[in-house]
């Protein structure tokens, strides 16, 4: 695997308290696998390496107005948001978790759908000449897969950091990875770290 840092972005998906933390609204769905797969530390390594090598670091986060007037709960996942009143803009659990806090030059994209490939993300990628996207985050079979599918259809080279993603169950994760293998490159954190080299002047 080869990566050109100048044209590569690492995208961390939904690393928010309500989604990945033990006290979050989605903890009954996702927390056990986040912990057992050691996802947070692997994402942290990917992001640190991306910054050191000169890649673009992007976070996508899903959050809604305090009155939820921008929430269209047309799917079971979004109905959970509606029922739990979670992922509310301005709440601590809607923020990126402190362990993965964005650095000054990182990009944070906020959206209101399950997938995060929104016009704001497209604009950042085009402005920076990005053609390769490395995805990590939660959940593999929901937001990661949804965003990655749109990205590959848009013509980007897509790489899934398989061991830096998780879903509600190992089976759901594996089924998603098998589907994504038809559309993207499936790699490990070690593969991606090994393909990255520090930016030279």
Where are these regions (language model features)?
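Short beta-strand segments at enzyme active-site cores
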Residues: 55-62, 67, 161
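N-terminal nucleotide-binding beta1-loop-alpha1 segment
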Residues: 11-16
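Active-site-adjacent betaalpha module
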Residues: 1-9, 45-53, 70, 77-201
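Short, surface-exposed alpha-helical recognition segments that flank or form part
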Residues: 34-38, 112-113
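Acidic/histidine-rich helix-loop elements
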Residues: 20-36
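Short acidic/His/Gly/Ser-rich catalytic and metal-binding motifs that mark active-site loops
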Residues: 18-23, 67-69
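Generic alpha-helical structural signal
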Residues: 40-44
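Active-site/binding-pocket entry motifs
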Residues: 17-18, 115
């Amino acid at each position: 695997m080869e990566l050109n840092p100048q044209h590569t972005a690492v995208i961390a998906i939904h690393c928010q308290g309500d989604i990945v933390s033990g006290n979050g609204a989605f903890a009954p769905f996702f927390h056990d696998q986040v912990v057992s797969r050691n996802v947070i530390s692997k994402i942290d390594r990917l992001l640190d390496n991306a910054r050191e090598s000169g890649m673009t670091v992007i976070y996508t986060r899903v959050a809604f107005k305090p009155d939820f007037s921008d929430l269209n709960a047309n799917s079971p996942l979004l109905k959970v948001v509606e029922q739990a009143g979670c992922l509310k803009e301005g709440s601590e659990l809607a923020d990126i978790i402190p362990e993965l806090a964005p650095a000054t030059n990182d990009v944070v994209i906020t959206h209101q759908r399950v997938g995060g490939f929104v016009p704001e993300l497209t604009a950042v990628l085009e402005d920076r000449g990005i053609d390769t996207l490395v995805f990590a985050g939660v959940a593999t079979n929901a937001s990661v897969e949804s965003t990655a599918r749109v990205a590959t259809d848009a013509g980007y080279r897509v790489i899934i950091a398989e061991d830096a993603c998780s879903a509600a169950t190992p089976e759901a994760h594996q089924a998603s990875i098998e589907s994504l293998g038809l559309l993207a490159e499936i790699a490990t954190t070690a593969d991606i770290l090994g393909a990255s080299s520090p930016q030279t002047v």
